[in-house]
Amino acid sequence: MKRISAYFISLLIFSCFGAATGQDTISYNPKIRVAADIFGPVYYIADKNLLSLEGFLSVDFDTNKAAVIEIGYLDYIYSQYNYDFLSSGYFMRLGVDFNTLNPGTSQGKYYAGIGLRYGLSIFRAETPFLEHENYWGSVTGFAPPETSAAHFIELSPGIRTELFRNVSIGWTIRLRILVYSGTGKDLKSIYIPGYGNGTKVFSPGINYYIIWSIPYRKAK
């Protein structure tokens, strides 16, 4: 997994460097984009056990590449008849988006592509109640709060389209692979903020964004 992480980070750096040095032609105004996810708040209306708030900031390098930083917060509650689990924390993803549409089609307004991300989650997990039954009866206990850091990589295909001038909507599918859970192989967190199910190596997800675009340089 460490080799995979090193390779993934190298790929992101190479992609950014290549984009920064290859801007021979720009057919539209490069933009800074600020976005807020609405899927998390809407999902919270239906399920009060999961609150997810996140957004992203992206900066165009050229007509088909953009650097992206995503940040967010998540609070998760899980209850069963014999235990309760709580997890909350902040997460960040860094990476690059690649627009597969040609500049004449995208015009800085449309996106259909894929992103590469490296994610970090700093979270606090605890089990305030735990009950175990054995031959002599039931035993209750708890696991105190513990702060951990998890690492993961991600592919994020998605689409975006402009509704009004400099205002867009779009969705992103999250295909995540856990590199390090932060808790060791024998004790896994049920839910990792920004990643998902901490007991699985692969965790999918989805976001739906409202995006505000700000042109920052005139087209050549």
Language-model features and meaning:
Residues 65, 70-135, 207-214:
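Gram-negative (and chloroplast) outer-membrane scaffold detector with strong preference
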Residues 40-43, 78-84, 101, 139-145, ...:
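Extracellular loop and loop/strand-boundary signature of outer-membrane beta-barrel proteins
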Residues 20-60, 70, 209-220:
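Short glycine/proline- and aromatic-enriched beta-strand/turn motifs that initiate or cap beta-hairpins
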Residues 30, 49-53, 88-92, 110, ...:
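Residues that define the transmembrane beta-barrel architecture of outer-membrane proteins
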Residues 45-47, 78-81, 122-129, 180-184, ...:
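Outer-membrane beta-barrel proteins
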Residues 162-220:
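Predominantly the C-terminal beta-signal and adjacent terminal strand-loop region
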Residues 36-38, 55-59, 94-98, 116-118, ...:
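Residues on the lipid-exposed face of transmembrane beta-strands in outer-membrane beta-barrel proteins
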